């Protein structure tokens, strides 16, 4: 937490003039439109009770709204609902909102060899009751926040206070998802760098990003590996 706050002091000083934490702030409207994320239903077979949702591009409030709507729409007909991720990052608060819905719906998260999951996307990956990432395709990166909320009319001190609050929310969120403290610590350390730190297979397991939620696994054991009743997760 201390390292995170130290980096936030530097970031807060940057906010007023440079808005370094959000690349979208410096883009033209056309570029922003091109960079918008998309959400689609993937491989849905209601008779076989399989299917998922795939997310491509930056994670924003609009993307989260679409994803939540699709997840809820197919959840009653799917046993192992999977959320496939390919995102360079995005809005931290939006990512945690999506993560909360994913965990509520007992969905899996996955990043295949053709995808990527950096920055805020890692918060979404962390929410899966089972997490299946491809090594070297998941990376820790400096977090981005909604510019309108964090920059407009804020002094450096006020901005730092807001970032401190968000840091605590991220820490609490990861703990609630059952991830080790080490993940938050390493995400915090990455705030001081503009580079992406790719995670190999061993690191993904150490940080809890490759594996299952213990509570989910316990439920499966106690119920002879049956899936939770779909009606209970609506």
Predicted regions and their residues:
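Glycine-rich beta-to-alpha active-site loop
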Residues: 94, 103-147
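Extended, non-globular alpha-helical segments
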Residues: 70-71, 76-104
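STAS-typified acidic loop motif
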Residues: 33-66
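Bacterial N-terminal signal peptides
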Residues: 11-22
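Second-shell loop/turn segments in exported
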Residues: 52-59, 82-89, 108-114, 153-161, ...
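Charged, glycine-interspersed solvent-exposed loop segments at helix/strand-loop junctions
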Residues: 81, 147-232
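Boundary at the C-terminal end of the N-terminal hydrophobic targeting segment
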Residues: 24-30
């Amino acid at each position: 937490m201390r390292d995170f706050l130290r980096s936030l002091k530097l970031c807060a000083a940057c906010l007023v003039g440079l808005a370094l934490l959000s690349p979208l702030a410096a883009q033209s409207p056309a570029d922003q439109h091109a960079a918008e994320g998309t959400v689609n239903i993937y491989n849905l077979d209601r008779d076989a009770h399989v299917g998922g949702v795939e997310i491509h591009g930056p994670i924003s409030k609009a993307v989260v709204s679409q994803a939540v709507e699709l997840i809820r729409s197919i959840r009653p007909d799917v046993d192992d609902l999977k959320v496939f991720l390919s995102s360079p990052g995005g809005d931290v608060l939006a990512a945690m909102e999506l993560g909360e819905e994913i965990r509520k719906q007992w969905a899996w998260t996955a990043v295949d060899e053709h995808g990527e999951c950096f920055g805020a996307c890692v918060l979404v990956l962390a929410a899966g009751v089972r997490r299946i990432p491809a090594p070297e395709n998941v990376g820790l990166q400096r977090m981005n926040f909604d510019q309108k909320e964090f920059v407009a009319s804020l002094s450096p001190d006020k901005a730092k206070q807001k970032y401190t609050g968000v840091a605590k929310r991220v820490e609490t969120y990861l703990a609630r998802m059952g991830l080790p403290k080490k993940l938050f610590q390493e995400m915090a350390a990455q705030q001081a760098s503009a580079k992406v730190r790719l995670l190999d297979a061993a690191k993904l397991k150490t940080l809890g990003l490759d594996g299952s939620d213990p509570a989910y696994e316990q439920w499966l054991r106690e119920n002879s590996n049956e899936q939770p009743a779909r009606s209970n997760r609506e």
